[in-house]
Every structure is written in C-alpha cells, then in structure tokens.
C-alpha cells in the first residue's frame, strides 16, 4: 500500500482556496511573508485577486500603483502565474484555474486609499469620485472588499497554523480597515 503525504508546500497550500494555492504559498515564502509591507499595502496586493469589474477602456494588464515594493511583488506573482499556466499547458493539466484573467491590476491604489477613510462622508465621496471614474459599481466593489476579507481570513489561518506571527499581526487588522460603509452589518448596501 502506498502512503501519500503532503510536501511542506502542499500542506500549506491545502489551506488556501480563494486564490491559486501553490502560487500564493510559494510567493509568501519567497517574500518572507510580506515582511516589508504594511496592512494597507497588503490590501492593495490582495486586491489583484478580486474580480472588480473596471471599465474596459481603463483596465490595465500591469500593476497600477506608484508603490515600488508592490510593483515588484505583483510582478513576481504575475511571473508565477505565467509559469504555472505554461506548466499546465505543457503537461496537459486542467486544474480549472483561469490564468487569462486571473489578476486585476486596477484597484491597488484605490483599495489602499479605501483603508485610510475614517467616516461615512469620506466613504461616500470615494464611491462617488473614485469608483464612478473607474465605472465600478457599488455591488462589484462590495463583492471585491468581501473577497479581500475572505483571502485575509485564509491567510490568517495559515499564519496561525504555521506560526507566521509577523504577518498574522498585520492581517488581523485588515478587516477593520476595509469592512466599512458598504460591507458591514450597518451598511446601506448589504
């Protein structure tokens, strides 16, 4: 009888389902668990995994941010996506993951800005200015915020399970920065 066991990478990846599990775990390890990013930057990074529908003319295939650390880390993720897409194609593997539109580059800085908003007036202004300019609907934005929250929860569990304390302490602060106005129990939308 054969006994199958997870590799260390596979054990960590088995806790991830909101994003490409192997890419995320490899990326987190190579970036030393995002030690150089703060909570806001982590939100910007995670926003690339949302499916917030930005107006076609304003959509970008490269990271839309002036933050050099984020650009570098997102390019690393993009390279990993290309590598896995190529591997799956070469070995005729059909994982079901859609590599063609797997990353959304347009909401990085807007999501970082969203983290900084303090009250309802600022949130309303953001919705009427930033989201309207990008032609992003409030429903799509809310779903994107909830997706970020779901990814954060997975990463929190990963950090708790494997003892990545520095990242854990950053991640547990994120929901309070993003789940406001459009994505809370008191919100007007949900």
Tell me what each language-model feature is.
Residues 1-2, 39-190:
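Acidic, serine/threonine- and proline-rich low-complexity intrinsically disordered segments
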Residues 2-35:
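Accessory beta->alpha helical hairpin/"wing" motif in late/C-terminal subdomains of nucleic-acid enzymes
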């Amino acid at each position: 009888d054969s006994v199958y066991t997870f590799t260390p990478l596979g054990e960590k990846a088995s806790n991830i389902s909101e994003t490409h599990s192997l890419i995320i775990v490899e990326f987190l390890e190579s970036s030393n668990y995002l030690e150089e990013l703060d909570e806001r930057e982590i939100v910007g990074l995670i926003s690339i995994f949302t499916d917030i529908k930005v107006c076609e003319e304003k959509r970008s295939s490269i990271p839309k941010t002036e933050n050099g650390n984020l650009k570098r880390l997102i390019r690393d993720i993009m390279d990993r996506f290309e590598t896995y897409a190529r591997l799956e194609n070469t070995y005729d593997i059909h994982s079901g993951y859609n590599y063609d539109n797997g990353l959304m580059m347009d909401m990085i800085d807007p999501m970082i800005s969203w983290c900084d908003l303090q009250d309802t007036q600022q949130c309303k202004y953001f919705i009427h200015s930033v989201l309207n300019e990008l032609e992003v609907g409030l429903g799509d934005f809310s779903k994107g915020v909830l997706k970020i929250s779901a990814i954060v929860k997975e990463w929190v569990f990963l950090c708790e399970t494997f003892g990545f304390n520095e990242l854990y302490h950053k991640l547990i602060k994120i929901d309070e920065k993003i789940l406001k106005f459009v994505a809370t129990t008191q919100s007007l939308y949900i």
